[in-house]
Swiss-Prot record:
Residues 2-25 are virion surface. This is Envelope small membrane protein. GO terms for cellular component: extracellular region; host cell endoplasmic reticulum membrane; host cell Golgi membrane; membrane; viral envelope; virion membrane. Homooligomer. Associates with itself into higher-order structures, including dimers, trimers and tetramers. Associates with the GP2a-GP3-GP4 complex. Belongs to the arteriviridae E protein family. It comes from Porcine reproductive and respiratory syndrome virus (strain Lelystad) (PRRSV). InterPro entries: GP2b.
Length: 70
């Protein structure tokens, strides 16, 4: 009977261990997903800053031509 109880207790320990491993795996996956999301936001922000700076520098160069058109 002792062997049966030890097998049952070992089964519960293994199941709980697998549960903890799956929780940690999900947390790691969500952290990676959040990291990619933040990296995407940063990339879009930098792209908008660069494009805005380029457009502002071009409009400053061609401002006399633009004033003739306007």
């Amino acid at each position: 009977m002792g062997s049966l109880w030890s097998k049952i207790s070992q089964l519960f320990v293994d199941a709980f261990t697998e549960f903890l491993v799956s929780v940690v795996d999900i947390a790691i996956f969500l952290a990676i997903l959040f990291g990619f999301t933040v990296a995407g936001w940063l990339l879009v922000f930098l792209l908008r800053v660069v494009c805005s700076a380029l457009l502002r520098s071009r409009s400053a160069i061609h401002s006399p031509e633009l004033s003739k058109v306007l």
